[in-house]
Amino acid sequence: MMCSTRRLASRKMQLGKIHPTSNKETGVAHWIRYEHNGNRGFGVLDGDAIAAFRGDMFHDPVASGELLKLAAVTVLTPCAPTKMIALWNNFRALAEKLNQAIPPEPLYFLKGNGSFHPHGQPIRVPASYSGKVVYEGELGIVIGKRCHAVSEANAASVIFGYTCINDVTAAELLFKDPTFPQWTRAKSFDTFGVFGPVIATGLDPLTLTIKTILNGQERQNYPVADMIFPPAKLVSLLSNDMTLEAGDVIACGTSIGVGSMKAGSEVSVVIDGIGELRNRYE
């Protein structure tokens, strides 16, 4: 069942209220992509309005002077990545709970581009799978410029900002075949790569806390500071494996509290300073 126009409008208004006003002095801004009257655009979110920009979000964007009401647009994913790299076993608390060794290097997979999905739109029950589907609230790193083999010391210069991610997973598929773990299939159903609603710039990620709310109840609450490979190190190590493009997203992995969703569930990933990524599982 598609969300009603009234419900979507309500979510858009709520989206605008949960973000702090952009602060030029601190450099904090909340970038958003949208569709308005059939045209796609991007801008900076300020309360319940969007200050529109033109050009390239990642390279000297220019303010257009146009101001749009958030309730009048359709929210898109905040960028269009060429890839989403997603981490496994990147938090100490979860590694300890699962009795997993601390990995010597990042363990990761890629989510299919067709899975990318925005705030406010329903996550779909897969037609070809009827098992358990779980939420995974995560921090996302958004790359701001093309890079390869970046040092950890210089990694901050290629990070544009941070976003919220729900790394939705068909959990029973992961190890269904004993000869081949199905990470790609389990993670890449249409609508399973949920991220947004904004990219926040000017934040110190190590001060952030990630919460996941399922049907009004908090299920995850964990600090980014518990990360085994923090953002700068991740970007450095991953960029030595493959070239990262502007707009690429790194999902930093999740921690304790992952759980299943049932049809009709409302799930939100909340990171103070970034915002709330909210979707319904249908």
Language-model segment annotations:
Residues 10-27:
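Short, Lys/Arg-enriched N-terminal segments with co-localized hydrophobic residues
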